[in-house]
Amino acid sequence: MSLENKNIIITAGGTGGHIYPALAIAELLRQNKANVTWVGTPNSMEASIVPEYFNIQFIKSSGVRRKGIIKKITFPLKLAYNTLKSRSLLKKLKANLVIGFGGYVSGPICLAAAQINIPVIIHEQNAKIGLTNRILAKFATTICLAFEIENLHKQFSSKQLAKTKIVGNPVRKDIVALNDKARIYTDSSTLKILVLGGSQGAKAINEIIPKLIQKSNEQGINIKVWHQTGKLSLEETKDAYKDISQNHIKDIAAFIDDMAIAYNWADLVICRAGALTVSECAIAGLPAIFIPLPSAVDDHQFFNAQNIVNNNAGFCLRQQQMTLENLLAIIKPLNQDRSKLEQMSKMAKKTLIKNSSEQILDCVKKILNNK
């Protein structure tokens, strides 16, 4: 089915975990000749990222979780107002379908679409369903999940379960291409570790890695690190490396522009367990040590990591467990026997769905074909 002249609305915002999977789908829809418009919130991450690629419209929207009593009282009124404005926007755009990728902005747009009989697809990136998507699941035409979710039958009605599909997380094509490339773990004397602090950085991870390199060197483990610190921690982290030989450092940077190159370079990654990072590591076949963000809502990062850990493709340490001793207890055996890394890589590639974007596109075509 052709999507030519179909007006499809993408709504996602707040964090990269919502925005980047949505961008992957938006690009695929455009390649299929759909007219794509993004709806986000002003003064947010999507406002600085999306305009380079797509037309974006803005509505004001905010969450209620962990807010004061006044904001909780006024939230229903604001939601009703934003939903009404969203209805006007969708009519103006002549929307044929809305795809919500989470973030508070998805709420009013998807609710408005359901009210005026526009089909809605929602996509949940995490292994715990977020508050917005839990509400929207009642109104969605199709519910797409990235992971198998524990006790889903207790959260969804039989009607909701019937319209639920596990599709994985959309990731960039250059990362998907790594899935077909065999990782060769030789008996090289150097163990290449990619450290990802996330876009905002991860202070605890940034602080311990320089100490890990020093301790590893003392024990005869030769680590070379490519360390993405996040903008706020760059100078502080660089300072922590000042006494470490450059032979152990590939790069220390606030951001990595080309993640496919970084994933391809590494033998092992140490990172948080955001949905997109977990999906990219698995699809790229990169063994990981996940350190879930302790403050993540509903502990969703821990559950994201379990999809990989339970398939023997990675490890998970709570932040309070992230000691030099525990990290070395994982790294030392992997360094001594590289075949373990190779086996983990093979298992990682089998863990998650790599054609997620195409599966979501198929959902779009089926819905529009039946309208």
Curated annotation (Swiss-Prot):
InterPro entries linked to this entry: GlcNAc_MurG (IPR006009), Glyco_trans_28_C (IPR007235), GlycoTrans_28_N (IPR004276)
Q: Which reaction does it catalyse?
A: di-trans,octa-cis-undecaprenyl diphospho-N-acetyl-alpha-D-muramoyl-L-alanyl-D-glutamyl-meso-2,6-diaminopimeloyl-D-alanyl-D-alanine + UDP-N-acetyl-alpha-D-glucosamine = di-trans,octa-cis-undecaprenyl diphospho-[N-acetyl-alpha-D-glucosaminyl-(1->4)]-N-acetyl-alpha-D-muramoyl-L-alanyl-D-glutamyl-meso-2,6-diaminopimeloyl-D-alanyl-D-alanine + UDP + H(+)
The membrane-topology field of this record reads: Peripheral membrane protein
Say where the protein is mainly found.
membrane
Please state where this protein is localized: Cell inner membrane
Which biological process annotations from GO are given for this protein?
carbohydrate metabolic process; cell division; cell wall organization; lipid glycosylation; peptidoglycan biosynthetic process; regulation of cell shape
* Gene name for this UniProt entry: murG
Q: Which organism is it from?
A: Francisella tularensis subsp. holarctica (strain LVS)
Q: What is this protein called?
A: UDP-N-acetylglucosamine--N-acetylmuramyl-(pentapeptide) pyrophosphoryl-undecaprenol N-acetylglucosamine transferase
Q: What is its EC number?
A: 2.4.1.227
Free-text function comment from the UniProt entry: Cell wall formation. Catalyzes the transfer of a GlcNAc subunit on undecaprenyl-pyrophosphoryl-MurNAc-pentapeptide (lipid intermediate I) to form undecaprenyl-pyrophosphoryl-MurNAc-(pentapeptide)GlcNAc (lipid intermediate II).
Biological or metabolic pathway of the protein: Cell wall biogenesis; peptidoglycan biosynthesis
